[in-house]
Amino acid sequence: MLQGLALIKLGGSVATFKERPLAANIDAIEGISRALTRLDIPIIIVHGGGSFGHYWSVKYDMHTKPANYDVHGVSIVHESMIALNQIIVNSMIRAGLNPYGISPSALTTGHKPIVSKIKQIYAMAQSKLIPVTFGDIVYVEGAKYSILS
């Protein structure tokens, strides 16, 4: 069913300098973006948080288990991941690629994937866009949030 597709995990420790908060590894990101231009198959990118989201999730003691986390921390983690996604997407645009940033909260409900949205991402990749999503803090239910990694 999902043949002829490259799902690439761009680790946070590659995209960022994990020992320095909010420090993107621009050289690595741009090198990867240039390398992606040589692929001739549909691509989906998933990137980690590194010194962006991971840094803040540790600071606010957030985990993959749903819990009532500090909502200020939820905002900070989420916005830091959007910032890193923007850096990666912009690098890909400069390399001549066609990335499309997607927040993982648009793909889940109650910590479960929305199958139709996952299929939509595959269809986007088939149409020459490159979906770029990431690990993030997502709403689960009530006042509970969870790290989706």
Give residue spans per PLM region.
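Short beta-strand segments
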Residues: 7-11, 46-47, 102-103, 132-134
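Charged helix-capping and loop-helix junction motifs
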Residues: 23-30, 114-119, 146-149
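Short, active-site-adjacent cap segments at secondary-structure transitions
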Residues: 14-16, 50-54, 107-109, 138-140
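Flexible, active-site-adjacent loop/turn segments at secondary-structure boundaries
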Residues: 12-13, 50, 75, 105, ...
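N-terminal low-complexity or amphipathic/hydrophobic leaders
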Residues: 33, 37, 44-51, 55, ...
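Short acidic, glycine/serine/threonine-rich loops at helix termini
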Residues: 18-20, 55-59, 112, 142-145
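N-terminal glycine-/serine-/threonine-rich phosphate-binding loop
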Residues: 1-44
